[in-house]
Structures are given as structure tokens and as C-alpha cells.
């Protein structure tokens, strides 16, 4: 930020994340701290906080959400998990997300450069509809020609497994990622 000020950057655009806060997971706290530092920097800034981003499965070795779900959950010889809190699975897979395509996020970045209304403003970005985890799993399965059978999976079991296994690279999700997944990831306004 100091260098951006020094060289006279006209607008600093930051990719943050939906759900950032000072008391969240390490990822959420780090993103929140970056947002706060930029807001206090003296720069002209715009912050985008997208919901779940999908698209571009060839993106420089970074995991793409739908591809990762297909490979890590739908290609296995057992049902896809529908996570739930509590003792009974009545709400299995019911948390929601507003997925947004990476190209839409990129368009917002580009368009914001010339729009005065975007200066010193934060935008939550999400797709046109909120989908439950159950619906997302179903749609990815349909699109990839995979089976769609699912089974309720209690959060407590996954968290215990994650606390033991998330240090291994082959384990598909960290404890923090799982915590954020269960919080849901929707936005109140879709841009």
C-alpha cells in the first residue's frame, strides 16, 4: 500500500471475500485486515467481496470449485456428503451459496475502474440465485455425468476427521474451509 501511494496509483482494487470479519477463521480475519488497511491507506480504493467463485478449471494450478467437488466427492465410490449440524439430518445440505462465475467477477473489476460510484466502496458479488449445498452437488453431478446419490454427514464427524487429516495435502478440505462452507456464502444484493 505504501508503494502504491508513493508511485501515485489512481485506484487500488482489492479482491476480498464474502463473509470477512475480525473474529472469523484465519482466512476471514486476514481478508478483513487487508480490507481495513486499504480503507485507512489514503488511496482511492474499491473492494470486491465475491461469494463462491467458479469457472476456469485450468486456472494456473489453483483448484476450481466445481472441478474439485467433482474430483474429490463425486468420483469416489461412495455417496456425496450432505453436511448437517446437530443430531438429526433434517437440515442436511441446506446451507446456501450464491456462486458467481470468474468472468463475471473480472467484468466487475474492469467496469469499476471508470465508475465514480465504485470509488471508496465495497461490493458484495454473488450469482443470480442462491443454491443449497444439496442443489450444488446435484448440478455438478448432472453437468459432469456423475452419479447423484448423497448421504447425510454429521458436521461433528467431519470436524474430528479434519482436525486429524487436514495437515495432509491429499485431504480435500481444511477445518477453516469446512467452517466457512457450513456458514453458507450468500449475498443480499447481486451485481
Name what the model sees in each region.
Residues 18-19, 52, 155:
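Conserved beta-strand edge residues that scaffold enzyme active sites
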